[in-house]
Amino acid sequence: MRIALKLRHQTWVPSFVTNFFGKELGGGRKKEEELHGKAVKVLDLLHHAAELGHTDALYALSQLHLFPPNQWFPPEPGLSYEELSSHASITGNASSQALLGFFHATGYKDIVPIDQAKAQLYLTFAGHSGHKGAQMAMGYRYWSGIGVVEDCMTALSWYEDAAEQVMAKFMSGPPGGRTLPLVPAKLSDLEGGVFGPGASVASTGLNAARPVIKTANARAAGEKWDDLLEYYSYNADRGEVDFAYRLGKIFYQGSIYGSTGGIASGGDGASRVVRDFHTARHYFLRIARQVWQRDPPNPRQYQTPKEKNPPSAGYAALAAGYLGRMFLRGEGVKQDAAMAKMWFERGAEYGEKESHNGLGIIWRDGLVDGKKDLKKALTYFTAAAAQDHAEAQVHLGKHHFMRNELKQASVYFEAAVRSGSPFEAYYYLADIQSSIARNPATPAEIAGSSCAIAVSFNKLVAERGLWNDNLLEEAEIAWNSGTDRGKELAMLKWWVAAERGFETAQNNLAFVLDQDKSILRFTRFAPQSPSNDTARLALTQWARSAAQRNIDALVKLGDYYYHGLGVADEPKTTRYEKAARYYQSAADTHMSALAMWNLGWMYENGIGMPRDFHLAKRHYDLALETNTEAYVPVMLSLIKLHAKSLWHTILGGEDNLNLWTFEDAEGGASHFLPGTLRLRC
């Protein structure tokens, strides 16, 4: 039996055997029966409480039926809709109304027909009751014209309400604000982009250096973060200070890759690791002790050395900045502003920017003995901002913003955005642009531009501040479970988030539903015919993602119209023309070599646009200029194009299909005469 229990962990053993071992020999079947019994009991108790008029039990039932937490609770979206309807009618609860709006907006599982008017009604009530998700959904609907006429100012009002909630939550945290959630990853990015590495805009050019693409490359190479951490630990234990510092950063931010902009900017969600403040402090303290062997009995008695040009502290100064921040915020240690100030002063001796920023917060807010000194605070913030520290630039911008010096404030906020600020700077810039848009004296064209900027920035703030109801993170966990039930739950959560305007959720949902991945689609080996309903849903999500500046999604839209996926009822001519327009829109960004190649092929074959070999060659050339990885397909296409043109010219053609001309000695053009061969484009 011991041997059998060990065999169940071997990958070469058939799954039906390991399942048997797990259930029969490991006691799994008995445990399953116990858990199933507990789930039935929970549902029975909640049903009984709901029948007795307990509205919280009614809402809990609706959540269990719509978002079952595990396999013991079966999904029952139809029951969930009925329970949400009852709960909303009895209590007017905003959360129930928001989910009812989702059902009517999407027609999920055909429980109710799609009715955008009813969706609008439920979401409006929920939004006015303060439900942030409903406010975001309303803002997105007015911004995109879903069920309503596009109205930027109305969209701005809804997104402002959501962003204000998020900012209030952010400011309720420790000094410096709450820790930002990690940036969620797109499923397609983890595979090198929608079209794979090399062909997708998401993984070519400057985008190839994005943390999520580095993570995708690491996964493709079979690397695991546990192996990386073990390697770093091995080198750190040998006294390699740079590896110890990297480990401290990784465990502090809970991610292998941090965002630009400083400590406060968060990290990448694709390279997530378990966050461990105690381990981070261990490594930072080990580094710092190489310069500061001991601490004074009273940190308030610490005095900065008078030496004007102290020797370089290297990583110790950087570690001091992190240690000061941890004491300032109570992360892994007891919150102690005096200790924080001591560590910040140590780092500031060596000009470390995080330490300058931390001292600015302490003096501005009077966190040590209530002593405030705005002049000192501004001096420290300026020193950090001069080193492109995003958070310090935000603090300087806020200082001018509070004094109504909006022009100077904008300068600092814009500098913070360039330095990598992912949150606060956008909030205040949105407020400034909103005031411009609402000013009656502002010209209409400027007001419209300011409104669009304000909506975009408020939307970004509302979507980043997900400390509660983080649908993207919950969906990621469900998807990574690997079970069919988990994947179905993940898609539901992405769908809810997509209706609230999250481009990541729209991309994920479209990518999962995408039926145009197989290169065999148009051969006799093609898989079964795609579902037009599923393709239509994917097309909708691709369109919404493309409208939020996802270039690969824009190319996908062209593919769907070209292949007739989700638009089978439209005539081919119309579909090809629309496909060409989408490819052209993507090509105009000068980032998608694939879109340019597609356009070249359509010009070459006269599909969706007039046949023109000159424009075909031009787009093939542009594809290669945009992405050198397109060398092989572009060269093959050019060879074929010139062969076609040569045959056309031999037959006497002289129109836009003739790429071949000869220049005679007089400089005139003639065909097939001695002279210098020139390819014309």
Please give the residue ranges for each predicted region.
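Short coil/turn linking the two alpha-helices of tandem helical-hairpin repeats
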Residues: 1, 62-74, 101-112, 139-149, ...
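Catalytic cores of eukaryotic secretory-pathway lumenal/extracellular enzymes that build
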Residues: 93-95, 102, 112-116, 120-141, ...
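TPR/Sel1-like alpha-solenoid repeat signature
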Residues: 58-61, 97-104, 122, 135-141, ...
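Terminal, low-structured helical/coil segments at or just beyond the last alpha-helical repeat
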Residues: 234, 627-681
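Short coil/linker segments at helix-helix boundaries
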Residues: 2-37, 72-75, 114, 143-153, ...
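Hydrophobic/aromatic packing residues within the alpha-helices of TPR/SEL1-like helical repeat arrays
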Residues: 46, 84-85, 123, 159, ...
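Short helix-capping/linker turns of helical repeat alpha-solenoids
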Residues: 51-58, 67-69, 90-97, 104-109, ...
